[in-house]
């Protein structure tokens, strides 16, 4: 089942939101506010999660609060990869969460955390164990990124070489499984920490790994899964059939579904990271997906959605 709707992914990361098009993030805040209200109208019980921050930046939260966005979301989220590209040590995880909690009382989830096997499989295996130790009890949801390595053929957009996120080549080696599906050393370590640790795994359009991934997730004892439904992909042929197949395959998990990626023909710039010309269209997409996969129109909320997110 879908347990939460996430609005965009890493909005303060150039790889997912173009700061040239929207240098003060006012367009993002407006778009996300519209989407949050649209989700609320379709299902008032479904928690709305602000796309996970990467890097973890309390000043960015204050900026969005200034635009009024935080009044329309129920959960904040952060992403961290301290052994690979963050400018802080892995042992600082509790402090990084405290920085966000110091500026907002909203529930806080860790919707991506990972360690790559780029340097050595043993480093990643140690990272799984240490991450579980550090984050245990500190967040209601902790999603390991990811089940599979990224396909090496994919392109990647990075930031300045001195900024967090610059070592993007490591991003392709975050999986517990290699691109060909063979297990890494970290897989067995991860299984020791489920269901407290969940998984974040994106499935690309008509991803042939879907059934195999579901089998692995069940074998590992995963309960909480984060994935995405791409607004850009919704314009591909037979997109709804693919979305239906994906959601049906994942029905046994508690799914946080992420809505993001601008269709090129709808962006201010022809790129999936661009702000859309008409943000209302993103809100419509979110509403349509919630109505299809997590319907709740007409339901009366007896508790704030934040309580369902705790």
Task: Name each region found by the language model.
Residues 1-56, 214-310:
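Substrate-binding cleft and catalytic face of glycoside hydrolase catalytic domains
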């Amino acid at each position: 089942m879908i347990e939460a709707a996430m609005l965009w992914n890493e909005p303060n990361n150039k790889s997912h939101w173009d700061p040239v098009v929207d240098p003060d993030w006012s367009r993002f805040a407006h778009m996300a506010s519209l989407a949050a209200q649209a989700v609320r109208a379709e299902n008032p019980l479904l928690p709305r999660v602000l796309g996970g921050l990467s890097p973890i930046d309390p000043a960015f939260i204050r900026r969005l609060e200034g635009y009024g966005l935080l009044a329309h979301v129920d959960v904040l989220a952060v992403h961290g990869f301290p052994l690979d590209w963050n400018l802080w040590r892995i042992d600082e995880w509790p402090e990084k969460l405290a920085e966000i909690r110091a500026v907002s009382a909203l529930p806080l989830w860790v919707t991506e955390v990972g360690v790559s096997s780029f340097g050595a499989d043993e480093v990643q295996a140690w990272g799984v164990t240490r991450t579980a130790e550090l984050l245990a009890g500190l967040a209601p949801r902790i999603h390991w990124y990811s089940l599979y390595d990224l396909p090496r053929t994919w392109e990647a957009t990075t930031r300045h070489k001195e900024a967090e996120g610059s070592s993007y080549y490591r991003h392709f080696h975050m999986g517990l499984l290699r691109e060909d599906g063979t297990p890494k050393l970290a897989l067995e370590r991860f299984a020791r920490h489920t269901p407290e640790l969940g998984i974040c795994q994106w499935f690309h359009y008509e991803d042939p790994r879907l059934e195999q991934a579901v089998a692995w997730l069940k074998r590992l004892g995963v309960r909480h899964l984060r994935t995405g439904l791409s607004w850009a992909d919704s314009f591909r042929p037979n997109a709804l059939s693919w979305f239906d197949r994906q959601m049906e395959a994942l029905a046994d998990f508690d799914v946080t579904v992420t809505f993001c990626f601008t269709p090129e023909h709808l962006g201010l710039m022809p790129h999936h990271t661009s702000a859309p010309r008409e943000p209302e269209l993103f809100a419509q997409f979110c509403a349509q997906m919630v109505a299809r996969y997590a319907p709740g129109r007409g339901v009366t909320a007896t508790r704030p959605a934040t309580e369902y997110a705790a």
